[in-house]
Every structure is written in C-alpha cells, then in structure tokens.
C-alpha cells in the first residue's frame, strides 16, 4: 500500500498569512501534493492546530526560536495555525478534511508543540496513531510533502523512518 502524506499544508505557512510563519511560495505546493496523492492508495492530512493560550507563544518575531525550558514545547513561536483563524485552514485546492483517509491534528494541547506527525509530544511518547494506522494498512511506501521542510516535514520523515518498514520518499513539494 502506498500512502501520501500532506504535512501541514496550511495557509499559516504561506504568504497568505504574512504575520504568521510564511514560507516563500508555500501556497504553490497544492498541485504537487495532489500529484503525489494520485500515485498513492491512501491520503493522510496533518495540521497544526494551536491554542491561544499556548505556553510557547511570543508576540514579537524577534523573540522567536528562543528556548522555553519546557520539554514538550522547546522553542518560542509567534501565533500560527490558531484554530478558527485563516492560518489554520488547509490550502485552497486540497481535499476537505473528510476526504482524507486519516487526519492528525498537532499541538492542540497548549502545553505541547510537536513538529512531527507521529507523536503529540517532542519526547515521542504520546502517539498520534499514524504509525499504527500505517502498519494496519500494510504500508510499504510513504510519499511525504508539505510545509515547512526544516521542522514539521523533516521531523515527520525522521519519525516515519524509525517507525516502520516502509520506504519514505520526500516530495519536492516539501
């Protein structure tokens, strides 16, 4: 079974939300993500889903990426992908949430700020169920694309490599 994973393909990581965490041309990955999904049997969506009371929040971008001292929210970040905001939304042109075969919402708990899609916590003790679901699907290949490469895509790929006996392909849309 081949599974395609859209990692955090949300407006928060695009120029559409310039005050959040925009990735240059991030909004242009939709066509590539849809092409990768066409090669797969199943499709997974991951989404950052943050709370306004998150303990890692800072108001000023100058204060970002500083250690927090918390084990499951290691760095400070400006508000992004807050549930109910434009940044939380999937990119236009992607399927609706109900059209995906499996969904992972990350960072819902204000105490946690995970990067990868396989665990709710940085210490990798609280599974999101993704690895287990992939095993139940008899997955032999995973194609990963999304935003942003340096944190969420990278961590998801590393977790997938440790978590199963499948090939992991990183798409250029990452």
Regions found by a protein language model. Give the residues of each.
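Active-site acidic carboxylates
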Residues: 1-107, 136-140, 158, 162-170
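Short, surface-exposed loop/turn motifs that are enriched in glycine and acidic residues
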Residues: 79-84, 119-123, 146
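A short glycine-rich beta-strand->turn/loop micro-motif centered on a GG-aromatic cluster
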Residues: 143-146, 150, 165-174
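Amphipathic coiled-coil/heptad-repeat helices and related helical stalk/stem segments
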Residues: 26-29, 87, 126-130, 153
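Short acidic/polar capping segments at secondary-structure boundaries
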Residues: 11, 109-110, 147-150
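Short, well-ordered secondary-structure micro-motifs
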Residues: 56, 114-117, 155
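Histidine/lysine/aspartate-rich catalytic loop segments that bind and position anionic ligands
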Residues: 96-137
């Amino acid at each position: 079974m081949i599974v395609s994973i859209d990692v955090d393909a949300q407006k928060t990581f695009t120029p559409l939300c310039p005050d959040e965490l925009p990735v240059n041309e991030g909004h242009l990955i939709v066509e590539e993500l849809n092409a990768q999904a066409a090669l797969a049997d199943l499709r997974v969506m991951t989404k950052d889903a943050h709370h306004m009371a998150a303990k890692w929040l800072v108001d000023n971008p100058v204060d970002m990426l500083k250690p927090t001292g918390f084990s499951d929210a290691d760095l400070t970040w400006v508000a992004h992908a807050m549930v109910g905001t434009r940044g939380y939304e999937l990119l236009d042109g992607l399927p609706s949430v109900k059209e995906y075969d499996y969904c992972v919402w990350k960072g819902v708990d204000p105490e946690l700020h995970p990067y990868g899609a396989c665990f709710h916590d940085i210490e990798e003790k609280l599974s999101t169920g993704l690895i287990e679901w992939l095993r139940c699907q008899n997955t032999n290949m995973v194609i990963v694309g999304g935003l942003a490469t340096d944190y969420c895509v990278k961590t998801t790929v590393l977790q997938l490599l440790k978590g199963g006996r499948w090939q992991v392909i990183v798409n250029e849309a990452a």
